[in-house]
C-alpha cells in the first residue's frame, strides 16, 4: 500500500480541475432517463463524480446510502456506450446479490425507452 492512498474515512475532496455538471449538460437521452427516474436535478455526488467518469478517470466514492452513487456511475456508462458496437461495453460488479438487484433495477429504469440493454 502506497503512502499516497487515502485512509478509510479520510475527507479527500476532488481536485478543482473539473467543474460540476448539471442535468442540462447531459445528453437528451440521459436527461429523459433522469426525468423518468424522477430526478429533477443531479444530486451533489452525481454532479461532482460524473465529469471525472466521463473523462475516463477512476473515482472512489464514499457516501451515505441513497445519496445517488448508483446514478453517478450508471449515467456516465450510459453516455459512453457506442450503440454501433454490438459487444459488451460495460460490466458492473457489486459484492452482494441484494445490491446487484438494486443496481439492476436502477439500470433497467434508466435504460427504459432507449436502445441500451442491461
Language-model features: locations:
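Conserved nucleic-acid-binding Ia/Ib motif block in the N-terminal RecA-like helicase ATPase lobe
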Residues: 27-32, 39, 85-118
Amino acid at each position: 500500500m502506497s503512502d499516497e492512498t487515502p485512509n478509510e474515512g479520510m475527507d479527500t475532496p476532488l481536485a478543482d480541475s473539473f467543474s460540476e455538471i448539471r442535468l442540462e449538460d447531459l445528453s437528451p437521452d440521459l436527461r429523459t432517463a433522469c426525468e423518468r427516474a424522477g430526478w429533477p436535478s443531479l444530486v451533489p455526488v452525481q454532479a461532482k463524480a460524473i465529469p471525472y467518469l466521463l473523462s475516463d478517470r477512476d473515482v472512489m466514492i464514499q457516501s451515505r446510502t441513497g445519496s445517488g452513487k448508483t446514478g453517478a456511475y450508471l449515467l456516465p456508462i450510459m453516455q459512453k456506450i457506442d450503440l454501433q458496437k454490438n459487444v459488451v461495453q460495460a460490466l458492473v460488479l457489486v459484492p452482494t446479490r441484494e445490491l446487484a438487484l438494486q443496481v439492476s433495477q436502477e439500470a433497467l429504469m434508466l435504460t427504459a425507452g432507449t436502445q441500451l440493454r442491461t
